[in-house]
């Protein structure tokens, strides 16, 4: 920016940024972690909706059992896994620590525990498929145990990352709370 009188006016050459305030690191981290958790929640909702669709088709007998198998037992309690995701979303607007803690605890109960049970429930069928090449449940021509193990592995990864980011977000919120109490 040049002035009519001659050289550039003082402070307009871009060297005046050092006195400006910066956003605290825990606020930047909070925004980033909220965004990552929201992405994971949306991926979880897609998995959840696919599971609901599969269960609905199986129970309502819209297709024959040769195409869509009846649901495994672990799929019923996993339907409650949408509750931790909703609690997590509710905790974001006002940085509500208690909702985030409830979300993390209920994620273990409603998301991780059914997935662990599901891996144990489907293991004999997977073992039989691996050893003898026989499958008794099918999803559109594919072995149901293979497809459901893929879904299970994806869901475990989504929930593990969601727990990891939630813990980091909780630490970030505690940092900002402790700084406010010191002042």
From Swiss-Prot:
Compartment(s) of residence: Endoplasmic reticulum membrane
Gene Ontology biological process terms in this record: defense response to fungus; endoplasmic reticulum organization; granulocyte colony-stimulating factor signaling pathway; insulin metabolic process; insulin secretion; neutrophil differentiation; neutrophil mediated immunity; neutrophil migration
Membrane topology: Multi-pass membrane protein
Modified residues (Phosphoserine): 3
Domain of life: Eukaryota
Pfam families noted in UniProt: Jagunal (PF07086)
CC annotations in GO: endoplasmic reticulum; endoplasmic reticulum membrane
InterPro entries hit by this protein: Jagunal
Name of the featured protein: Protein jagunal homolog 1
Native source organism of the sequence: Bos taurus (Bovine)
């Amino acid at each position: 920016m040049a002035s009519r009188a001659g050289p550039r006016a003082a402070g307009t050459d871009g060297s005046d940024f050092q006195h400006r305030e910066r956003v605290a690191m825990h606020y930047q981290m909070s925004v980033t972690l909220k965004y990552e958790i929201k992405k994971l929640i949306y991926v979880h909702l897609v998995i959840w909706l696919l599971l609901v669709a599969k269960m609905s088709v199986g129970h309502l007998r819209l297709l024959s059992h040769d195409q869509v198998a009846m649901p495994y037992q672990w799929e019923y309690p996993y339907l409650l896994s949408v509750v931790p995701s909703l609690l997590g979303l509710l905790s974001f607007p006002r940085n509500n620590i208690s909702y985030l803690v409830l979300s993390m605890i209920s994620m273990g109960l409603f998301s991780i525990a059914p997935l662990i049970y599901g891996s144990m429930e489907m293991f004999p069928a997977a073992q039989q498929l691996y050893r003898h090449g026989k499958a008794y449940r099918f999803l559109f021509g594919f072995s149901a145990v293979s497809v459901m193990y893929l879904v299970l592995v994806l869901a475990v990864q989504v929930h593990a990352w969601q727990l990891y980011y939630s813990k980091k977000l909780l630490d970030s919120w505690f940092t900002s709370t402790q700084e406010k109490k010191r002042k």
